[in-house]
Amino acid sequence: MTHQTHAYHMVNPSPWPLTGALSALLMTSGLIMWFHFNSTTLLMLGLTTNMLTMYQWWRDVVRESTFQGHHTPNVQKGLRYGMILFIISEVLFFTGFFWAFYHSSLAPTPELGGCWPPTGINPLNPLEVPLLNTSVLLASGVSITWAHHSLMEGNRNHMLQALFITIALGVYFTLLQASEYYEAPFTISDGVYGSTFFVATGFHGLHVIIGSTFLIVCFFRQLKFHFTSNHHFGFEAAAWYWHFVDVVWLFLYVSIYWWGS
């Protein structure tokens, strides 16, 4: 900040956007190769380059914000707007999945037997694993709020405890969802019911994994004293994202599991 007279962060040239774009190309091409030719080589290469890009890019962001002081109040304001717009774009993504579900279920075609769930589909009981999943995610929403309040009050130990509980609940949710998929009496290829169910819940499951990763990074950063009560946007963004994942699950549970069954 010694050589500039403004509060904005002029980012240095970085290779990570380019490697990120290349890894995305490799992953999507790898998915096609996996689906059509049962070869995972390209997919594994894409995933590896993606993980390396994420690690090194976020490492640079942490250095710039925590150690070099580039994240001034003005820069943080821009990051907040960016995170809000990102979450809005995710809301629109899920809107598409809900649209597909309601379009198919509110007026079932004769091919589906004129009923919902379609003829031959045995839906999951919403009062079993899905209800447990709901309570797990709601509990994690409480614990992440506890972590945020503890951080604001400067209580580091409580913040770490609450954050650890949130991460554990996120991992537990993922394991429950995986077991539910494994035991489900229908598959993604079982017509429109299977495809809308697995795409919507699977995409949400992916968001839980991303959110858990975000929180794990925050946990290790807090172990190294990176957050203070007035400088912690990395954690705040993770908390916003986690609450978004919570709310989406409530809509999924009510729509697909409860009403849709």
UniProtKB/Swiss-Prot annotation:
Keyword annotations of the record: Membrane, Mitochondrion, Mitochondrion inner membrane, Translocase, Transmembrane, Transmembrane helix
Transmembrane segments: 16-34, 41-66, 73-105, 129-152, 156-183, 191-223, 233-256
Catalysed reaction equations from the record: 4 Fe(II)-[cytochrome c] + O2 + 8 H(+)(in) = 4 Fe(III)-[cytochrome c] + 2 H2O + 4 H(+)(out)
The UniProt record lists the keyword DNA-binding: no
EC number(s) on file: 7.1.1.9
SUPFAM superfamilies cross-referenced by the UniProt entry: Cytochrome c oxidase subunit III-like
GO terms classed as biological process: mitochondrial electron transport, cytochrome c to oxygen; respiratory chain complex IV assembly
Keyword Membrane: yes
InterPro entries on file: Cyt_c/ubiquinol_Oxase_su3 (IPR024791), Cyt_c_oxase_su3_dom (IPR033945), Cyt_c_oxidase-like_su3 (IPR000298), Cyt_c_oxidase_su3-like_sf (IPR035973), Cyt_c_oxidase_su3_a-hlx (IPR013833)
PROSITE patterns named in the record: COX3 (PS50253)
One GO term describing the cellular component: respiratory chain complex IV
Positions on the Mitochondrial intermembrane side per record topology: 35-40, 106-128, 184-190, 257-261
Subunit structure of this chain's protein: Component of the cytochrome c oxidase (complex IV, CIV), a multisubunit enzyme composed of 14 subunits. The complex is composed of a catalytic core of 3 subunits MT-CO1, MT-CO2 and MT-CO3, encoded in the mitochondrial DNA, and 11 supernumerary subunits COX4I, COX5A, COX5B, COX6A, COX6B, COX6C, COX7A, COX7B, COX7C, COX8 and NDUFA4, which are encoded in the nuclear genome.
Function summary: Component of the cytochrome c oxidase, the last enzyme in the mitochondrial electron transport chain which drives oxidative phosphorylation. The respiratory chain contains 3 multisubunit complexes succinate dehydrogenase (complex II, CII), ubiquinol-cytochrome c oxidoreductase (cytochrome b-c1 complex, complex III, CIII) and cytochrome c oxidase (complex IV, CIV), that cooperate to transfer electrons derived from NADH and succinate to molecular oxygen, creating an electrochemical gradient over the inner membrane that drives transmembrane transport and the ATP synthase.
Family indicated by similarity: Belongs to the cytochrome c oxidase subunit 3 family.
PANTHER family per the UniProt record, alphabetical: CYTOCHROME C OXIDASE SUBUNIT 3, CYTOCHROME C OXIDASE SUBUNIT III
The protein's name: Cytochrome c oxidase subunit 3
Gene it is expressed from: MT-CO3
